[in-house]
Amino acid sequence: LIRRTIVVEQQLAFPEAIHQSEDALFNMQMLEYVKSVDFLHETLTTYRVWGMSSFQRFHADLPQQMEQVNQQFLTFGKVHHKGDFYWNAYEVWLMETYIRLLKRYFYHPNNPQSEAEKKRAWKALLTTCPSLKQLRRASWKKMYQSRKSYPLLLFFLLYCRCYALNRRVMEWLLRTDRY
């Protein structure tokens, strides 16, 4: 694990892949030892050095990088037979990372896409991303209990569910020739 203090003191420069890996390792460690989803949120927002994170810059391949990291988390949890604490924390971490992706990728000031292109890309991500399929299955009750003061998470899940429902209704209408 790369220690942040050494990186800051020695003013070392690493490529973005190292920063991404460091983010993943930090979060993996937190998911291992945390016993409360609320504490995970507090730790991520309070004790995190965001300046060294790759989420601060615009990258065209950021959604693909995030999906690779998420798949590693899923594989790690399944291989090591993690319990409910891990999976609850993983769902919240996943929501927070996709909210950060929404802010840092789709609404980034350096994003060259037009508003229509951003909306199409977001909808494509919602339908094709395996991690977001897991988020759509997340429990409303669990999310409400763990994040009462985080309305953006509610909006995020509501948007995912509404889009998925709308898609299912359209598929049904097309299948039954009622559209």
Regions found by a protein language model. Name each.
Residues 83-92:
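All-alpha amphipathic helical-bundle segments outside canonical DNA-binding/catalytic cores
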Residues 30-34, 54-57, 96-100, 149, ...:
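Short amphipathic alpha-helical patches
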Residues 1-2, 93-94, 98-99:
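Solvent-exposed aromatic/hydrophobic patches embedded in short alpha-helical segments
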